[in-house]
A protein has these predicted regions:
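Short beta-strand/loop motif that positions the catalytic acidic residue
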Residues: 235, 241-243
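N-terminal cap/lid segment of alpha/beta-hydrolase-fold proteins
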Residues: 24-45
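Accessory cap/linker subdomain of secreted extracellular hydrolases
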Residues: 158-229
Length: 313
């Protein structure tokens, strides 16, 4: 074989291998409404279904990371469920990823997030019309999944670390564990009560603006109107609630309230899983390291809990 032929053969082989990789489809970029996402496809097997991931609150990107935390939890979960035979779609939220620099706080709204996820769900259904499409919501994302399921009728919903109470109750509980002086905690609770009554508070002290900026107050005001348990009771598609026993942000009694209100759903409590889906001790201070340790794997019981639900569909 001449050098030229060898070169051509090598080039063709590279193209063939690249096409094989694309056909196996490990990671495919996706884009809708100016937002970016990653489709992860199972290799060498027909997909059993497709799953849209809906991330938790704050500026969380498609991998489950934010400026304050890097866990790679959603990336790991997407890869693991792809290995189990499912297409997964992980997306950046408005305000994260490549377009973050062009977004102002006023652009981030509860209704806007909901519209974005509804558009991603439609994208998945149109792209894969012959397989079931599921919603997987983490933390606040579980509420979005619940609200979407009332209208768009996915094949099922997977609620991971979901709140079971309105966010005003969750916020008060979370704030009570922080080292605020009593007068500051009273002020915080008063602001939360006003938001629950759909009233904003002006002249927030600078030290609390990160919690109660004008934009966040408007966001919380909408969020607080939804009781996750009452909304889940309206859903008619199958669901599973997966709660972590060592979750210091959303305690297991949240999942217990959801399953009491909507008993047709499945329920799994993973005793040693925390809010970012890692295995940690019960002590919240000791578990802080998992919020910035992308090398730490997912809790080993999480993926089996999800696939048990999916395989029963």
């Amino acid at each position: 074989m001449t050098a030229v032929l060898r070169h051509c053969f090598t080039a063709l082989l590279i193209i063939f291998i690249s096409l094989q990789a694309a056909a196996a489809g490990k990671n495919i970029p996706a884009e809708i409404n100016g937002l970016n996402g990653t489709l992860t496809l199972p290799e060498n097997t027909a997909p059993k279904g497709a799953i849209l991931f809906i991330a938790g609150s704050g500026p969380v990107d498609r991998d489950g990371n934010s400026p304050a935390s890097r866990t790679d939890s959603l990336r790991m979960l997407g890869d693991a469920l792809s290995d189990a035979g499912y297409i997964t779609l992980r997306t950046d939220k408005t305000g994260t990823g490549a377009g973050a620099a062009t977004v102002t706080p006023a652009d981030i709204t509860f209704a806007g997030y909901l519209r974005d996820y509804q558009a991603w769900f439609d994208f998945l259904q149109k792209r894969y019309p012959d397989i079931p499409v599921y919603l997987l919501g983490h933390s606040e994302g579980a509420l979005f999944a619940t609200l979407m399921a009332q209208e768009q009728k996915p094949a099922g919903i997977i609620l991971v670390s979901p709140a079971g109470y309105t966010i005003d109750i969750i916020l008060k509980k979370q704030m009570s564990t922080q080292p605020f002086p009593p007068e500051a905690l009273t002020y915080i609770n008063d602001v939360i009560d006003r938001l629950k009554a759909e009233k904003t508070t002006d002249n927030i002290p600078p030290s609390l603006n990160i919690l109660f900026s004008p934009e966040l107050q408007r966001y919380f005001m909408v969020w607080m109107q939804y009781d996750p348990a009452e909304e889940l009771a309206k859903v008619t598609v199958p669901g599973v609630i997966i709660q972590g026993g060592h979750d210091c942000q959303i305690s297991p009694d949240n999942g217990a309230r959801l399953i009491r209100t909507a008993p047709d759903n499945q329920y799994a409590e993973i005793a040693t899983m925390n809010h970012v889906l890692k295995e940690t001790p019960a002590d919240c201070t000791a578990a802080i390291g998992s919020y910035n340790n992308p090398a730490q794997p997912l809790h080993p019981e999480l993926v089996p809990a999800i696939t048990r639900f999916l395989s029963g569909r």
